[in-house]
């Protein structure tokens, strides 16, 4: 097993590049199953364990998958005779595996998918997915830990209203509806940039999806889709994490490929704190002064403040004066990292769905464990400014969403190593 060891106190300077988006590449890879002709080539693919997992799922479904990690490219040929079952062995590792259900229903008219796994942050129910599939004409039942879905006469377009703008449900329903008969209108959808990227990919394959990025998405079903080449958008969460790494060390860093339009709520909060963000065509220069102002943060569905930046923002707020409140409205049970911050002498408490930070914490190095993907990054950020040595374990979480995170920080001047123990 590996751990990351950080000696705090170094100011970060230099330039760092953002990878392709984890939360965009996974649905785009599953959408490749929709193409009954040709092969798809996906580029700007990040070298993450989740990408390997979803590739294994696609291979299990009998798609031909070639992954060139050096080039950051994946070739997917789904013109084969697809299998209907995504087994627990892979689906249990990652929730995004549920996203094969929409494409399988669309292509085959039936699918068997194990109930998903992934990060342990809240219930993350899949009722919205099931509700959407049923509205399109699928019959669903749960048995022995599997979801069984089938249609008698194929999927048919309809009007669907989501109870909550679930990202996964929005993606799954778009994919299912892309080959359905007629028009589907989905209201109260998720508006994340990753939804827009998926819609763009399906349209490049010959689909007809409009309205992605707004409250309502319309899909006109087509008879077939074909493989194409598509470049994955930059990862706005990695970009945000690297921006905070610069700010927390009061550094001077250029984050290449950070997209301003993808991070408006985070930018607003950082600028409110006094972080300087100079956006250019190809990225952003980040600088910060010693004294940052306190702000309150509330996570919300996009375009609100992203829940995936909550723990990193807590790390930064620990270094600012004053009273700060962070309220989590998207996932329950997403303050497990607070106990680890407290091991580092953080003055932070949790009350219900809010975390409260009193004053500026004099962070001290400690041995801490990552509780989920974003918490792993946040604890490393705290270690950058803690007095003494911080050791972060449970790096399997980190590897699900960040490529060579410690190497990137090291290139900017951090005293950080990844060691086997």
From Swiss-Prot:
GO terms for cellular component: cytoplasm. It is found in: Cytoplasm. Its main location: cytoplasm. It catalyses: phosphoenolpyruvate + UDP-N-acetyl-alpha-D-glucosamine = UDP-N-acetyl-3-O-(1-carboxyvinyl)-alpha-D-glucosamine + phosphate. The keyword Ribosomal protein does not apply. Phosphoenolpyruvate binds at residues 22-23. The active site is at 119 (proton donor). InterPro entries: Enolpyruvate_Tfrase_dom, Enolpyruvate_Tfrase_sf, MurA_subfamily, RNA3'P_cycl/enolpyr_Trfase_a/b, UDP_GlcNAc_COvinyl_MurA. CDD domains: UdpNAET. One of its GO terms (molecular function) is UDP-N-acetylglucosamine 1-carboxyvinyltransferase activity. Keywords: Cell cycle, Cell division, Cell shape, Cell wall biogenesis/degradation, Cytoplasm, Peptidoglycan synthesis, Pyruvate, Transferase. The modification 2-(S-cysteinyl)pyruvic acid O-phosphothioketal is found at residue 119. Cell wall formation. Adds enolpyruvyl to UDP-N-acetylglucosamine. This is UDP-N-acetylglucosamine 1-carboxyvinyltransferase 2.
